[in-house]
Amino acid sequence: IGLLKKPWGQYLVMEEKFQTTYRLNKKEKEEAVDIILSTYPDAKAELDHSNPFELLIATILSAQCTDVRVNIITKDLFAKYKGPEDYLKVDVKEIEEDIRQCGLFRSKVKNIRESCQMIIDNFNGRVPETIEELMTLPGVGQKTANVVASNAFGIPAIAVDTHVFRVSNRIGLAYAKTVEDTEKQLE
């Protein structure tokens, strides 16, 4: 058993395997969020991008891949492919080779190309700006939609992955059994 000092002065007793969870009351949650926001005032996506389309592609590539690896891949990828049309002009094999290092490359290429076609056909060549519309694109789930919506369009959204889920529930910011419920509680 060990002690974990919470930033606002209290101690939390942690079991050896960190299975203990702590429920914060509303005031404690607000204090914790204030500390996080003051500590990380300029928090943003770690994926390199210069426009919403690049962020969408980078976020699709980030599944089961580190942001560092994605940023290495997208440096050349974004120089080669400027917009949705560019991904549709070349052979699938060429794009697969371009993103091979990020894993799951075949399904990612399929999703990217289908998303590009939908962006052209359904959204006048522009990345959709709502979470609901983003989630109609192949390979875009709640987390990806939230990342794009919040970072590209300034829409308040929290991207809850397994890490955010685990830590939020462990330190008491949420008390939920699913990623979806954790997201609702963090909003």
Locate the predicted segments by residue.
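Catalytic cores of DNA base-excision repair glycosylases
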Residues: E15-E187
